[in-house]
Amino acid sequence: MTLSPEKQHVRPRDAADNDPVAVARGLAEKWRATAVERDRAGGSATAEREDLRASGLLSLLVPREYGGWGADWPTAIEVVREIAAADGSLGHLFGYHLTNAPMIELIGSQEQEEHLYTQIAQNNWWTGNASSENNSHVLDWKVRATPTEDGGYVLNGTKHFCSGAKGSDLLFVFGVVQDDSPQQGAIIAAAIPTSRAGVTPNDDWAAIGMRQTDSGSTDFHNVKVEPDEVLGAPNAFVLAFIQSERGSLFAPIAQLIFANVYLGIAHGALDAAREYTRTQARPWTPAGIQQATEDPYTIRSYGEFTIALQGADAAAREAAHLLQTVWDKGDALTPEDRGELMVKVSGVKALATNAALNISSGVFEVIGARGTHPRYGFDRFWRNVRTHSLHDPVSYKIADVGKHTLNGQYPIPGFTS
């Protein structure tokens, strides 16, 4: 195959022999010390991304026969949550990396799977995505893919919200075949080197949260896509959605990862608030107590936070195990399998979103006015959850669950459902 980015990053030989969750916790402990400062600065988390590269975790889901960790989905989800607890931006970046790589297996060929998985594992490649566009609606894609005589394409246009594209080695991109081609209107997917001539990830990401995710735009100017870099036939993803084939698992995978990013952030907010309440919060004088930790209303709040997380965590872990069961069915996947998984994941997404938003804003009630000082950075938890939770309206996830409960309907397969 032609896809061989110039950057080579040799993977630690014994990485896959370690416990990935323990590795993630070690990294999280290191990053937690600089999270507030880095959030304030914004920009790129270059050093932290290199930490992840050196850890070998970028090949977490790569099968062992290709040199990866060979982790299952429940383990991968746990790693995402650990990272997000320390830094929402890094949890976001790593989560997106985990949604990108499975596309190789979901719609690519056996040859592409072997080649790309091996390269990711051996060279510790970061993957980035270039799918969304900032047009009239979410699927109004204008990046054009012009077919070439050799079976490849040439891409032109601009993608937006390209999380992780900057600093990545392998870029997953979608384009629409131009109107004067026999394939007109078809959506093509490809995995290309980010260093390919004509690919320009831009430094134009600006939002109230997720400030170190490099989620800005990426320009494509006469970018050549080689024939063996095209994943599946034109409209492979669309057909997978229509027929509830294995490729349609992209949506529940992505949504479950997003939910666990939120849960990780909620855990991070709760842990940080608890430490502050124990060590710095002042008791309310009329309460007649000596320590803030004795306040009955504060105690109740921490109980409510914890209970909300217990329920959401349990649902998320149950969904991760169901994902593994469905994933293992391979091509024997049925529409019912896919539908049951998506309903479960939709419920988790709603639980996680509500818990994370409530906890990340509610912690201010238990830390008090002094805790709002910027040096503590408590606001970053809410800003991160609020920013990413707008990715797709959670109300539609709740409606999907309701339609199934009331009418036995499964969500219509798509990029977010």
Swiss-Prot record:
Pfam families: Acyl-CoA_dh_2, Acyl-CoA_dh_M, Acyl-CoA_dh_N. InterPro entries: Acyl-CoA_DH_C, Acyl-CoA_Oxase/DH_mid-dom, Acyl-CoA_Oxase/DH_mid-dom_sf, AcylCo_DH-like_C, AcylCoA_DH/ox_N, AcylCoA_DH/ox_N_sf, AcylCoA_DH/oxidase_NM_dom_sf, DszC. Its main location: cytoplasm. It is found in: Cytoplasm. Transmembrane segments: none annotated. One of its GO terms (biological process) is dibenzothiophene catabolic process. Keywords: Cytoplasm, Flavoprotein, FMN, Monooxygenase, Nucleotide-binding, Oxidoreductase. Gene3D superfamilies: Acyl-CoA dehydrogenase/oxidase, N-terminal domain (1.10.540.10), Butyryl-CoA Dehydrogenase, subunit A, domain 2 (2.40.110.10), Butyryl-CoA Dehydrogenase, subunit A, domain 3 (1.20.140.10). Its EC number is 1.14.14.21. It comes from the Bacteria. Reduced flavin is provided by flavin reductase DszD. Homotetramer formed by a dimer of dimers; FMN binds between monomers of the homodimer. Belongs to the DszC flavin monooxygenase family. This is Dibenzothiophene monooxygenase. It comes from Rhodococcus erythropolis. The gene is dszC.
